[in-house]
Amino acid sequence: MKVTKFFGLWILSVLCVLSCTDEEQGTGNIVPNVATAPVKLSLDATPMRGTVSTTRTRGDNSLDLVLGEEAGKTVNTAGTRAGTLTDAQEDAINDICVFQFGNADGKLKYSEYASLTDGQLTANISLASGVGTCTVYVLANVGDLTQKVSYGSALADFKKFAAEVSSGKGTGQNLPMCGYKADFNSEADNASLTVSLTRAVAKVSLNLTTPNAGDAFAVTSVRLMNVAKKLYYVESATTAPTVAELTTYTSDNTKSIAWYVPENKAGSNSLTDWKDRYEDNVPATATYILIEGSYTPKGGIARDVAYTIYLGAGDKAGDFNVVRNTKYTINAAIKGTNMNDGRVLVGKDLSAAGTQTANCYVVNTTDANKWYRFKATIRGNGAETPAQISYTGAVIPANDRIAPTNAALVWETREGDKAPTLDYVGYSRNGYVVFKLGEATEGNAVVAAKNGATTLWSWHIWTTAAFDRNGIKVQTYETRPRNGLASYANITKREFKMMDRNLGSASGTATKVAEEAIKTYGVYFQFGRKDPFPAAGVMTRTNDADIVPVYDA
């Protein structure tokens, strides 16, 4: 076996560059008068933990998951990557860093780097002699990190050794590993040392199955979301990462994908139903697979859809931890768009997953997709509502949540008194109002989220062929505050962008043709109220004017 070795004991934080060949020792970092003794090191890789998959059938119109998500156990710059490795590649060892800590004082006594060039699992290394009982750590496939751990460093600090990574693989495209031998004495153990290594990353595998016969599902994106950036080399993380410490891994959108990722101790809760594993019910930093695409049921219309699959222990719906040296195998059979499964998101999201909510949503009727959704557990844009205008008579705090159980159409216009604005309004288990566009090219509707028969909140839906961000012109206006009055002293000049038409209008063109003029009216609002009323249905009147007809069913 050919082994390239670099020895390092550090007293100063000076970076020394070593240039060595096979079997050549670098001597620039060795502390004088430290005696070493040869030791034969044997390594093995502990298999990744996995479990028997559990099948959870959801029916023909749902997401059927066969989960192999089980808890198991076993930054300086390191690496993590997507792409399946063979078993041999997952076990391969490209290089090692050896760190020797004295048990008496818990300080680093010696470190060494060796490059294993022929794939063998044995190496002739050196350790400091005269140390007595010690603990020897071996890091594999992480490059030479001996320069990162100074001589005399505390073992407690070494155990926190970590790096930010951009994928899950280390040097030589092999997986980062760690192992240790406690209570080792090189002078009493026949100069032989055996260390079992476990991978410092988890493996996430997705196998995607085609839909029911006659249905079609076109995948547009498969991503692994909320992946921890920080890879802990030695010991597991004790806390969940922050939002800033998370990233996203992409894929080639094929039906068989593998990622290697750092562990993520996102936590657990009391969930017992797998259909409740969705955004509002899980830890904010939990890792999940997001599958997006267009689903077309047999004889139906294509709809944008997303499926969210959170990782965690396969036999515990409330577990969301991703742990090192563990396989998470997800066999996902896409079988429909069941809105009673919280992991299924039907329609294009108008509210950016609840981060950009509003009281009015505008959709383009010329888009191929006809299904939309918006978060309905937040009132409007989530702003605080003063008691003076609150429908409850009390202050509604900012981002105060509501808990609907169903949704319904309040009213809608119909183009030519026939073509409906909306074909469907419903409520999904994960807190979204879902609606499908009707045949009307221009229209308005009000939909409500309810708890049984009680309306909790309502929203205006404006559907138009003109809303392509080009068809509706925008004019910028500038305010001119008055001068000389105390009440206007703190008012500054502002700019506002205004559309060329009223909200809900089918046209912005001035005309004297009655039929076309009516299209410019849009909807009416009573001062202080957020929901619109249908506008006039005639251009001229003598007494009372007819309004545009509206329908509630």
Language-model region placement:
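Tryptophan-paired
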Residues: 64-151, 205-324
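A short, Gly/Thr-enriched small/hydrophobic beta-strand-prone motif that recurs across taxa
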Residues: 26-53, 59, 64, 71-78, ...
